[in-house]
Amino acid sequence: MPLILEDALLSAADGLVQSGSKIWFHFQKYPWDLACPEQNPGVGEHRRHIETRLTQGLPDPKLAHVLSGTYHLGISPHIYSYYHLLADLLPHLIASQKFPVLVPEFMPNQFIDLLKEAEFEAQVLSPEIFMVERLLIPEMNIPDWNSEKVKLIQYFFEKIVPLKSLPNSQSSNSEKRIYVSRKLAVKRHLSNEDEFLPLLKKHKFSKIYLEHLSVPEQVQLFRSASHVIAAHGAGLTNILFASADVKILEIRPVLTSGQFCFENLFSLGWPRSEHLVPPLSGEFALPLELLDEVLERWQGEPKT
């Protein structure tokens, strides 16, 4: 359930919310009571995130701009990520009564365009302090995914991105083998991509930069995918739109990348998924022999 606060102080730079002696960070993921420290987690990720954030200070009510009315909170430190847009914010907006959504300046324009296309009113806030008359904060589930959330997202995109709705879109029966490159990403890009691309080309894979595609274009691409190979990253969230028999290879820097977030997602409807962890620590490179083994095995498997 969303948390509903009245006269809440909001730091629009990162989404920290304060009401009285209580604060919330990363939507409802990290609550904290300033007046009762004994009730807060003593150790762990929760405490670390809050203590780090508190070094920056709390919102100053003297600097607050007043926002009258009711709003959804759409600001969190990771809301620039496609994964967190779909896992954290969209399910809340879909299931809630429509009010304007407060989003940060750092939210990508294509995310804002998606919200507007879905008839959500997005209000972009500068990184200042605001006093919000009534604020709805999204709930954070553990784990991130469940069957209900998956169906909610899929149904939502079926309405706003119908099949064959885009120019030159492929039919649902077409089969595309795609490799999602993270070469344009700041982190988690495979250092030896140029070495294994010929092997992928041999097996009829196409290299895709999701940064060059709109959200609807990404949805359509994955609807037509028969095989997906990608390093651990937000683009794999698009498996939500792939068929149940798609073959997936997730390449992780370490076994526990993202606290198994995609493994959890794939377990809800995509049984033909697997992962590889490069054997050399400190280097995110994919050995050709490991990739070749997977590709040859896939090649020999009968079509379903």
Predicted regions and their residues:
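The feature primarily captures lumenal catalytic ectodomains
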Residues: 1-304
